[in-house]
Amino acid sequence: MDIDIHTTAGKVADLERRLEEAVHAGSARAVEKQHAKGKKTARERVLELLDEDSFVELDELARHRSTAFGMERNRPYGDGVVTGYGSIDGRQVCVFAQDFTVFGGSLGQVFGEKIVKVMDLAMKTGCPVIGINDSGGARIQEGVVSLGLYGEIFRRNVHASGVVPQISLIMGPCAGGAVYSPAITDFTVMVDQTSHMFITGPDVIKTVTGEDVSMEDLGGARSHNTKSGNAHYMASDESDAIDYVKALISFLPQNNLDEAPYDLDRVEDTAAELEPTDEDQALDGLVPDSPNQPYDMHSVVEAVLDDGDFLEVQAMFAPNIIVGFGRVEGRSVGVVANQPIQLAGTLDIDASEKAARFVRTCDAFNLPVLTFVDVPGFLPGTDQEWNGIIRRGAKLLFAYAEATVPLVTVITRKAYGGAYDVMGSKHLGADINLAWPTAQIAVMGAQGAVNILYRTDLAEADDPEGRRAELVQEYEDHLANPYLAAERGYVDAVIQPHETRAEVVRALRLLRSKRETLPPKKHGNIPL
C-alpha cells in the first residue's frame, strides 16, 4: 500500500512501516535457519531475558552508511544488533544482542556505535550491562572501522569493570578479536553445542600447525568450562543460560556504590532463629576420623546459606575449589571453599586463579566473602612449578589482602603451610576467623613433618613404622590442632561444627558497618 508521507496520517503509517521492517530485519529464511540450530533470534532472547513489556529499544532505525561492495543496496534497520534497556525482576539493566540473521551478526561501524552507546548509558546510570554474542566477527566490507569499534567496546569493558556488573552470553560464534570483550566481563555463560569462542578457528589452526580439531573441541562450551576456564557456566540450552543470568543478577548490586539486593523479609527479622537445625547438627559428624578421607564441602556451604540455596560459578573448572553466591539472612554473600573430594582440596594454578578472580569480583561489588578451609597445601609437581604456581598462586593472596569487604573464614580441617595463609587468614586481613575442633593448623601435615624432624630417630629405631606412628600421633596431638592458633589470636574462636551458621550470622551482622580503606595509590601491581 502506498503511503503519502506528506500527511500526518501518512507520516504515522510510514513510521509504523519502518518499525515493522526493523523488527523483521532478518529474512524469514535466516530466521528459520537460526531456529533449526536450536537458537533464538536476538529479539527473542532479549524478550525472554527481560521482564514482560519492560524492553525499551534504542537506535532501532539506525542503518549502516557503507557503500563498498554494493552495501548501499542492503541497509536493514538496526544494522544487525538490538540494543536498549529494560528490567529483570524490576531492576534496570542495559542489553545488547547481536543478530546473526542480519549480515551474520557482523560488526560494522553503526553496529559498534550502538553497543558503545548502550554501554555508556549503563555506566552513566549505574546499571548492569548484559551482552548477547552471536556474530560472525568483523564486517569485512567496512574495513578497519570495524576494528576501531571493537577497540572502543574493549575500552568501555575495561572502564566499566568494577563499576557495573557485566555479563556475557555466548549464544553462537564469537571469534577473533571479538572474544576479548566477553573475556573482560565479570561472567561468561555458554550454551552446550551451539556456542563457540576462539581466537583462531579450526581451519587456520590446521593450516598453520597441522592440528586437526573440531569447532566444538576447540572452542565449545564444554572446553571453555572445563579446560580454559574462560566460561563460568555451561547451559543445556538458551533458556537455561538466560535463567542462570537472571539468577546471577539477583545476587549482584546495580553498581559498585550500591548494596547487593536482599530479601527484605529475612533482613527485617533481626531475631532470626539461630538454634541448630538438623542440617547444622549433621555437621558435627561430617569430618571423617582419618585426615586422608574426603568429604563434600558443599554440605558445609549449604548448611550456612539461607535454605541451602547456592549458585555455583565455574563448577566444571578447577573443581578442587568451590566458588559461588548465596544469602545469609537474606543478604548476598560470596563463598570460596576448598573441596576435599577433588585433588584433596589442594590449591593448584587453576584453583588459585579461579578463586582470586572471584574474591576480587565480590570485593568490587560489596559482597562479603565466606571462606571454608580444608587445604593440605599447594599441588606439588614440575608442571605446576614451571607453569607459574608461584606467580599465579600469589594472585589469590593478593585478592584477599586487598579486599575491604567483610571477610569471614571457617577452618574445618587442614590448613597447612602457605596455603593456610592464602585462604583468607587473619594475617591477610580477614575480620572473623573461626575453626572447628577438627582443624589442623600447622606448617605441614604430620607425615611430612615427622620425616623431617625425626629422620635420624626413625633411621635408628628398631621398629621404624611403629615409631613413625607414635611420632605422627604426637605431632597431631600437639601441633596439628586449632588451639595453638587460638592461643595467638590467629583464630577468634574454636566452635562446634553445628554452631557454624549461627556464628557466621553474628559475624556478618557485626561487619555490616565495616569501613576499611587501603593506602592511597593508583592501583596495585597484582602478579598477572
Positions of PLM-derived features:
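Ligand-binding clefts of soluble mixed alpha/beta catalytic domains
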Residues: 1-528
